[in-house]
Amino acid sequence: MENYFVNSEKKHLIQSSISSYESIHKTIGAVPTVIEQSGRGERAFDIYSRLLRERIIFLGSGINDQVSDSLVAQLLFLEAEDPEKDIQIYINSPGGSVTAGMAIYDTMQQISPDVVTICFGVAASMGAFLLSGGAKGKRLALPNSRIMIHQPLGGAQGQAVEIEIQAKEILFLKKTLNSLLAEHTGQPLEKINEDTERDYFLSPSEAVEYGLIDKVIKK
């Protein structure tokens, strides 16, 4: 049954991943194109699709459902291609939807390959959470990147009962995220709770000491 899934879904997953990538990055700006020569002539790839073939995924925007669906599809496809070889995720994200981010996080934890997380630019909020969720020993950051953690943000309007429901959900998400951060960093939950009350910025070296990452990339 597993082989059938891989064979029947592989083509759909890669087409879905590439289409989502193209859609997302077209909204950001012009995407460089790579021309490859083959026995059948030239073939053009956008740079992100080409890097996907090298098991490199980019999270270079805010996190929403579309971004989440694209990353999950790519992770599943790369696992189907090779369940043993590492997958790299480069993160430059201000964060975004907690539920969309948790979909990416859960997939990272469930697939067989180790997921290498690399911060370039900034990994803030849910971006920092995903950075910390990479495989132990394989969570990295470039020297001048910035990392920020804080509690979930949210707003509610409507009747008092509806506001109360939303407030309970935000508190639940806060408890869940902080517990997982404590697990990934090795910090006491009380310290995580205190530090995330406000925006808490760290340099890469500080993030290593905190346990959010394992190493700063240097030449």
UniProtKB/Swiss-Prot annotation:
Transmembrane segments: none annotated. It catalyses: Hydrolysis of proteins to small peptides in the presence of ATP and magnesium. alpha-casein is the usual test substrate. In the absence of ATP, only oligopeptides shorter than five residues are hydrolyzed (such as succinyl-Leu-Tyr-|-NHMec, and Leu-Tyr-Leu-|-Tyr-Trp, in which cleavage of the -Tyr-|-Leu- and -Tyr-|-Trp bonds also occurs). The active site is at S125, H150. Cleaves peptides in various proteins in a process that requires ATP hydrolysis. Has a chymotrypsin-like activity. Plays a major role in the degradation of misfolded proteins. Keywords: Cytoplasm, Hydrolase, Protease, Serine protease. Its main location: cytoplasm. PANTHER family: ATP-DEPENDENT CLP PROTEASE PROTEOLYTIC SUBUNIT (PTHR10381:SF70). This is ATP-dependent Clp protease proteolytic subunit 4. Belongs to the peptidase S14 family. GO terms for molecular function: ATP-dependent peptidase activity; ATPase binding; serine-type endopeptidase activity. It is found in: Cytoplasm. It is an enzyme of class 3 (hydrolase). The gene is clpP4. The keyword Manganese does not apply. Its EC number is 3.4.21.92. GO terms for biological process: protein quality control for misfolded or incompletely synthesized proteins. Fourteen ClpP subunits assemble into 2 heptameric rings which stack back to back to give a disk-like structure with a central cavity, resembling the structure of eukaryotic proteasomes. Pfam families: CLP_protease (PF00574). SUPFAM superfamilies: ClpP/crotonase (SSF52096). One of its GO terms (cellular component) is cytoplasm.
